[in-house]
């Protein structure tokens, strides 16, 4: 019963986070849903456990939350970012992660989100 209550609280929190993203960028909600669908399908093909699939699904759905502190004009910017813009993007990402780290219900989700801007070739950030 306690586990169900905790899951319900986490689901409610995830919905609030999704609404926050939706308020900043209405197209982001559909994007988040597509990312979740593709991520879960990939996780199934990799035979992830049920709990890992749930974590992946949640992380994929709320991945835009880490960008909430991103200046709005960066969201639709075309072309390469300047060094100053890269620094701002990284800092906004770090602040978004810090915001989510204050939510113990999302500890595993945050562990996944920390790598959302990493690339297979080792480029990207934060590492």
Residue ranges and their predicted role:
Residues 1-5:
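Juxtamembrane or sensor-core-proximal signal-transducing alpha helices
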Residues 8-127:
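Histidine- and acidic-residue-rich, metal-dependent catalytic cores
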